[in-house]
């Protein structure tokens, strides 16, 4: 819950989540589409990956042998509300991303 609230409080993190919500997208495209500095984008994407709000959907290799990751948001929508002494966060998960995460977890066993 705290990671979600922290992400919502940061304009660049919200841009990254929005950009990767409906499709897997390379980091370089996020940098261009969201107009975020390169270093900042990588730092924030790594933070989102560490917190489980973003996942690496796939890794592609270019014809010249370079690897790059496509990332995707785990969240599809959020609803945050406050009720007497309680902060409630309801999340709708991006099913494609959640399935990928489950597949990866189960393949580790």
Residue positions per predicted region:
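Short, cationic-aromatic polyanion-contact patches
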Residues: 3-11, 26, 57-82
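N-terminal helix-turn-helix DNA-binding core of bacterial DNA-binding proteins
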Residues: 3-4, 8-36
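Short, charged/polar surface micro-motifs in flexible loops or helix N-caps
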Residues: 23, 47-51, 76-78, 96
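Amphipathic alpha-helical dimerization/coiled-coil segments
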Residues: 76-109
């Amino acid at each position: 819950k705290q990671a979600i609230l922290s992400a919502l409080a940061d304009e660049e993190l919200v841009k990254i989540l929005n950009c990767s919500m409906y499709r897997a997208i390379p980091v370089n495209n996020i940098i261009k589409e969201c107009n975020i500095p390169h270093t900042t984008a990588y730092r924030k994407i790594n933070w989102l990956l560490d917190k489980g709000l973003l996942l690496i959907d796939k890794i592609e290799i270019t014809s010249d042998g370079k690897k790059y990751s496509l990332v995707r948001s785990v969240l599809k929508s959020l609803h945050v509300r406050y009720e007497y002494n309680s902060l409630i966060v309801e999340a709708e998960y991006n099913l494609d991303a959640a399935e990928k995460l489950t597949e990866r977890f189960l393949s580790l066993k």
